[in-house]
Amino acid sequence: MTFTNTFKRKVCRVIAALAAVACTMSLAACGADETGKIRIGIKFDQPGLGFKKSGTYVGFDVDVAKYIAKKLGYSEDQIIWKEAPSKQREAMLQNGDVDMILATYSITDERKKAVSFAGPYFVAGQDLLVRKDDNSINGPEDLNGKRLCSVTGSTSAATVKEKFASEVQLMEQPGYAECATALFSGIVDAVTTDDIILAGLASASRGKLKVVGKPFTQEHYGVGIKKGDTQLATKINNAIVDMIQDGSWENAISDNTKGTNYTPDVRYNPPTPDEGEEA
């Protein structure tokens, strides 16, 4: 009897241990049930695009994601938002951690080796953010002798130095908020990245910063999905077309760039979403 009870206790402990391991491997099976929901990766730290604020999520990428999810049959309550840092986006899709990613995710041939895209849902252009009262910087060629901030790991500042202003002084910060702070305080003269990201920062500055408004590159923002899922790409593209046609796309741009006078480059926007579909 003693042996039997001891054996049972050992078996129970083994089962409990295995269950704990299973929980760490599959959240969907242990409490955080994701059945019937859609998991969407966004940025949590980009004002105007993807920003986590008091437990809610706001921004243009968020608005586009909500619209797409609704067209796919999911309510806002059925969306599970997951942070998608730039360096982790491909891995998150490959590992099945998310169903799609909308996180200023530029469509490139290199990335398409690992994942697929739908879209584009927006075409951004590299631009400059300056102080509201600074009229000396009207384009990248005006940055010689100036101090320019960009985010660590970005190639945007190097592009300016190589192509437009060889004498610009470069400074890196871990995030755009830190670059904006450096701009506020006069440590740098400008910040560079995609124009819509800069517009979000300008909107959050309450009129203290402005976007120069002369983009000099093109970045096609796509919806990252698992490689080869052409059916999902088609559905997402159809949703983006609907969003553009019913005015929701334009409203989302306006709502998330208030007070900046920001206008997307009309040469490329609104875009034609045809990425990822079967030929």
Segments (PLM) and residue ranges:
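Bilobed "Venus flytrap"/periplasmic-binding protein-like clamshell domains
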Residues: 44-47, 57-70, 127-180, 190, ...
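C-terminal motif of bacterial Sec signal peptides marking the signal peptidase cleavage site
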Residues: 25-29
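A ligand-binding cleft/hinge motif common to bilobed small-molecule-binding domains
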Residues: 88, 104-113, 161-162, 184-185, ...
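Ligand-binding clefts/hinges and TM-proximal coupling segments of bilobed small-molecule sensing domains
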Residues: 78, 155-171, 210-211, 241-279
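Acidic, polar ligand-binding/catalytic clefts
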Residues: 79-142
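Extracytoplasmic small-molecule ligand-binding "clamshell" domains
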Residues: 34-102
